[in-house]
């Protein structure tokens, strides 16, 4: 896109966000709206899957270019079968670049040994959280490992066509009564593709919302594809406002899946859009 049209697009998007976040007088019977919006408690991060076509050094350099200081590593950047020494070396390398390697994922677990491997890997790396997809029959084993290690498990929804966890509700119903450190990684794109409102899904998850993947999609159907944040159909200002009101204190990681061989421009636009919406919220108040 030409610079002029990109600037116009972003200016228009941020103006719309500011308008959406303005505070009309409450209707009769509505509680008064907060005059000073709460500051976001969540941090922005990067799902390294965004740079799946690139090595770790390039991925770290790109994370720094868009000023995303927290990173969740996918196994192409830190293989699950790595030795303890290799894991520690990679983590030291990431930290030396000023990045916080807060988690890993998405990690699939289809056997008891894969559950054991995932948690051993995360413990060696010092990860706070695993973004994972354990088979249904392994949820009990995964919860036991959460209790033993203190590492949180955020189960990722993958939208229409996923037989395990298509929606956040499909996760929540299976972990009801589990340790509170077992929860959901809310992928807003896949939620929207399932015809769901990501903001409502965040509310549904409540305290079980442990991680979130930020993206946008072209349609609220199974056919919806990835697109730069702000260009698709997701109500991103509404979603961000909901995270703020919920007091969500985890990481909102960008998982930009478009343009796999050249993702930086689209990622940068997406990060800029989200930061612009957050700035508009801070200036204009909450919805």
Question: Model-flagged regions — what are they?
Answer:
Residues 1, 47-50, 106, 130, ...:
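Short N-terminal micro-motifs specific to bacterial/archaeal maturation
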Residues 2-43, 53-66, 123, 168, ...:
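Histidine-acidic metal/acid-base catalytic patches
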Residues 14, 18, 57-60, 93, ...:
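Active-site acidic/histidine proton-transfer and metal-coordination neighborhood
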Residues 42-47, 71-73, 101-106, 130-132, ...:
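Hydrophobic faces of well-ordered beta-strands that scaffold small-molecule active sites
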Residues 47-51, 74-78, 106-109, 135, ...:
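Active-site beta-loop-alpha junctions enriched in small/polar residues
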Residues 80, 139, 221:
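Short glycine-rich, flexible loops that bind phosphorylated cofactors or substrates
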């Amino acid at each position: 896109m030409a610079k002029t049209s990109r600037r116009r697009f972003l200016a228009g998007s941020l103006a719309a966000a500011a308008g959406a976040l303005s505070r009309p007088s409450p209707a009769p019977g509505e509680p008064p709206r907060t005059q000073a919006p709460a500051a976001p408690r969540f941090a922005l991060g990067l799902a390294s899957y965004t740079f799946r076509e690139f090595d770790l050094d390039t991925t770290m350099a790109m994370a720094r270019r868009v000023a995303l200081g927290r990173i969740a590593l996918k196994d192409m950047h830190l293989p699950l079968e790595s030795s303890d020494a290799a894991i520690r070396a990679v983590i030291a390398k990431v930290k030396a670049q000023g990045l916080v390697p807060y988690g890993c994922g998405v990690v699939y677990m289809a056997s008891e040994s894969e559950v054991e491997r995932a948690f051993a890997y995360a413990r060696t790396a010092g990860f706070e959280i695993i973004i994972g997809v354990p088979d249904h029959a392994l949820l009990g084993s995964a919860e036991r490992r959460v209790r033993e290690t203190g590492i949180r498990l955020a189960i990722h929804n993958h939208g229409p066509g996923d037989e395990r966890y298509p929606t956040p509700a499909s996760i929540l119903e299976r972990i009801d009564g589990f340790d509170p450190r077992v929860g959901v990684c809310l992928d807003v794109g896949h939620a929207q593709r399932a015809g769901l409102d990501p903001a409502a899904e965040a509310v549904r998850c409540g305290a079980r919302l442990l991680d979130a993947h930020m993206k946008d999609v072209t349609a609220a159907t199974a056919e919806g594809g990835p697109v730069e944040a702000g260009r698709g159909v997701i109500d991103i200002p509404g979603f961000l406002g909901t995270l703020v009101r919920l007091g969500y204190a985890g990481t909102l990681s960008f998982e930009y899946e478009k343009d796999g061989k050249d993702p930086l421009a689209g990622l940068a636009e997406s990060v800029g859009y989200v930061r612009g919406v957050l700035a508009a919220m801070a200036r204009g108040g909450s919805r």
